Amino acid sequence: MAERPGSPGSREMRLLTFRDIAIEFSLEEWQCLDCAQQNLYRDVMLENYRNLVSLGIADSKPDLITCLEQNKEAWNIKRNEMVAKHPVTCSHFTQDLHPEQGIKHSLQKVIPRTYGKCGHENLQFKKCCKSVGECEVHKGGYNEVKQCLSNTQNKIFQTHKCVIVFGKFSNCNRHETRYTGKKHFKCKKYGKSFCMPSHLNQHQIIHTKEKSYKCEECGKSFKRSSNCTTHKRIHTGEKPYRCEECGKAFRWPSNLTRHKRIHTGEKPYTCEECGQAFRRSSTLTNHKRIHTGERPYKCEECGKAFSVSSTLNDHKRIHTGEKPYTCEECGRAFNCSSTLKTHKRIHTGEKPYKCEECDKAFKRHSSLAKHKIIHTGEKPYKSK
């Protein structure tokens, strides 16, 4: 549906299609993306298509979506010509923003996106710089520009050397919604309103607990394809994040970051009560319960409470009789991993607990504590 041409303020108004918001790459462009950027691209395109489906706009499934769902390379799909020939302006901004002439096949130059018309003129933004904050030409108006673009789609173009902010919008009302902050998209179930249909879609996923991405191996479902991809490493054994110091590999980058602190000695989490420092925030949280006396983990069988969930899990095995930790040396089984670890010292002869007074070493910390009484003369057990 379009207004009559020639009248003041005439503008093209039509339904948004997936082709309007699709971003497509050549082989050269696709190879410029690292693995994380390619995964992000897939997530964004699939999310955009789901948004159109939820609004009843999408017709037949595009080849690009079929390709992405099958994890095929996106550049196999023929690209559309999406380059404006003339400088364009937006009525919300005073300066002209010119698209680059002679676009090269590289993400570090310009990858345009096309939408339709907004107001009197098309709307395009393009500026290359090291980061969004360093965008000199658009520094004053960037916050407004940012409102006019999908946050998830912007992420794709934040490459190492170049930030591309590029777009047109097919609907002036859609553009003004982002600009003014008006919320036209309402959740029928809870009444909450959103500026963008994608935000409404994300909200609906939360309260419907929809999980679209399923692991074929174990059946576990996830809200994001990236989370499903990461989860699959449990089954495949893939550990792509390797420590340069010792060669140990990890499934997740966060685990590698924590591991590196072993080499650096960094302990960024400090207890305000006693000053003891820890490598992990979770360890600090558990430690604080020593001072507060909090024991939030309670055994339903006997009522005994614990400060750490793992200790409760170990305790429960007393009731069930389960002993999942077996010594490979002698076959003896234990109900918790720490007990097995201590037991193994019988076979290895390891004695990690050393007395500072006489250098005598022990397999158990409790044995060292008892030994120290010899030096202190302390008599903890009084006869009645």
Curated annotation (Swiss-Prot):
GO biological process, one term: regulation of DNA-templated transcription
Domain of life: Eukaryota
Pfam families: KRAB, zf-C2H2, zf-H2C2_2
Gene Ontology MF annotations: DNA-binding transcription factor activity, RNA polymerase II-specific; RNA polymerase II cis-regulatory region sequence-specific DNA binding; zinc ion binding
Alphabetic keyword roster: DNA-binding, Metal-binding, Nucleus, Repeat, Transcription, Transcription regulation, Zinc, Zinc-finger
Subcellular location: Nucleus
Main localization of the protein described in the UniProt heading: nucleus
Gene Ontology cellular component annotations, sorted alphabetically: nucleus
Domain KRAB: 16-87
Zinc finger (C2H2-type): 185-207, 213-235, 241-263, 269-291, 297-319, 325-347, 353-375
Described purpose of this protein according to its UniProt entry: May be involved in transcriptional regulation.
Protein family membership: Belongs to the krueppel C2H2-type zinc-finger protein family.
This protein's name: Zinc finger protein 722
Gene transcribed to yield this protein: ZNF722
